[in-house]
Amino acid sequence: MPKFVIEREIPGAGKLSKDQLHAISQTSCGVVSEMGPKIQWIHSYVTGDMIYCVYIAPDEATVREHAMKGGFPANKVSQVATMIEPTTAE
């Protein structure tokens, strides 16, 4: 299945407390569980005013459905074309 990077504009995201991040994570996992095996949350990166999430899903519509059900912004959804890393240079 395709992998997607979701850009979520959340002012002050980098200052969210451990408890707030826990609650956000629980909400996301609950929606994933409700939607079934067609979507999987891999991980997220939290920065100053953004959260970048990586999901596996059949299509962008499924990713956006997850965001809507969870009450999360999904300002930009990009399908990953490929991944590179240091070993790509070898």
Give the location of each predicted region.
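Generic marker of residues within folded, mature protein domains
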Residues: E34, H43-Y45, A67
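Generic, well-ordered alpha-helical segments
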Residues: Q20, T47, Y55-P58
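A short linear hydrophobic-aromatic micro-motif
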Residues: P37-H43, K76
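Amphipathic, hydrophobic secondary-structure cores in small proteins
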Residues: W41-Y52, V63
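Short S/T/G/P-rich N-terminal loop/turn motif that feeds into the first structured element of a domain
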Residues: M1-S33, Q40, M50, E85-E90
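Short, flexible active-site loop motifs that bind/organize anionic cofactors or intermediates
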Residues: P11, C53, A67
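Acidic/polar N-terminal loop/beta-strand segments that form early-domain functional surfaces
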Residues: E9, S44, I56
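An amphipathic, aromatic/His-enriched active-site/gating alpha helix that lines ligand/cofactor pockets
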Residues: I56-M83
